[in-house]
A protein has these predicted regions:
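H-loop/switch region of ABC-family ATPase nucleotide-binding domains
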Residues: 213-214
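Pre-NBD coupling/linker segments of ABC/ABC-like ATPases
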Residues: 2-49
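ABC-family P-loop ATPase nucleotide-binding domains
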Residues: 40-47, 97, 102-165, 169-177, ...
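ABC ATPase nucleotide-binding domain signature region
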Residues: 5-17, 60-63, 69-125
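Conserved catalytic segment of ABC-fold P-loop ATPases
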Residues: 221-228
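Helical segment within the ABC ATPase nucleotide-binding domain
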Residues: 192-204
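Conserved N-terminal flank of the Walker A/P-loop in ABC nucleotide-binding domains
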Residues: 47, 54, 62-63
Length: 237
């Protein structure tokens, strides 16, 4: 039985704003209705509180939809779960292999070849080199980039080609926990069709899905729990 889970208690994420003038602070405060909470501490250091005492418990079978306006904290939470951002307060426990589909190009090197980037992206995701080596052919085949391009630096790729490669690597392993910011669309119509099929399989086989979206239909179709964010806080669960 899958024992994956995500437990958060009073998680806080703040981003410091260096050299912020009083005028820029006032402007930030005026914009606060569409973002996190802006504040200055006793030493006049300005920071944006992107997540403010967020708590939840995700269990196997949960399909979580994160909703809210731009800057509400949805993507910040996904990046915290992916290990990109660290909380400044509170506790976060994650058990299970995470596949993050929010920053597909993360860990890729523009000067390295496509083949080298398969390993770089895979290692960044926590996959052992031996496991990547076993999947190398199937990843290359799924990307449809061909031998010539896979032996070239990815700086020579179009954005679509790079996305194909990153997607092929990211969805090549079993995921206990899947993190998504909207539903991915990859490449031309033909490639996108098989990418959508694979993505559906990855999500179906996962224990927990966390999906941030502005589309009520997408959330309704794929999620069984909804967390509504406002100014970095969960206002409805």
């Amino acid at each position: 039985m899958n024992q994956s889970y995500i437990r958060a208690k009073n998680v806080v994420v703040e981003f410091p704003i260096y050299n912020a003038s009083h005028r820029s602070l006032r402007k930030s405060l005026m914009r606060a209705t569409t973002g996190g909470r802006v504040a200055a501490d006793a030493s006049k250091r300005v920071s944006v509180r992107a997540l403010d005492n967020v708590s939840f418990d995700f269990k196997p079978g949960d399909r979580i939809g994160l909703v809210g306006h731009n800057g509400a904290g949805k993507t910040t939470l996904l990046r915290v779960l992916a290990g990109v951002y660290a909380p400044v307060a509170g506790s976060l426990e994650v058990k299970g292999r995470i596949v993050s589909l929010i920053d597909l190009s993360l860990g890729m090197d523009q000067e390295a070849t496509g083949y080298e980037n398969i390993f770089l992206r895979g290692i960044m995701m926590g996959i052992k080199p031996k496991e990547i080596e076993k999947k190398l052919y199937s990843i290359a085949e799924f990307s449809e980039l061909g031998e010539d391009f896979l032996n070239m630096p990815v700086r020579t790729y179009s954005s679509g080609m790079m996305l194909r490669l990153a997607f092929a690597v990211s969805t090549s392993i079993h995921a206990d926990i899947v993190l998504m910011d909207e539903w991915l669309s990859v490449g031309d119509a033909a490639f996108n069709e098989k990418a959508t099929e694979r993505l559906s399989q990855v999500v179906e086989n996962s224990s927990i899905l966390v999906l941030a979206s502005h589309s009520p239909k997408l959330v309704e179709k794929n999620c069984n729990r909804i967390l509504t964010f406002q100014h970095g806080q969960i206002v409805e669960a």
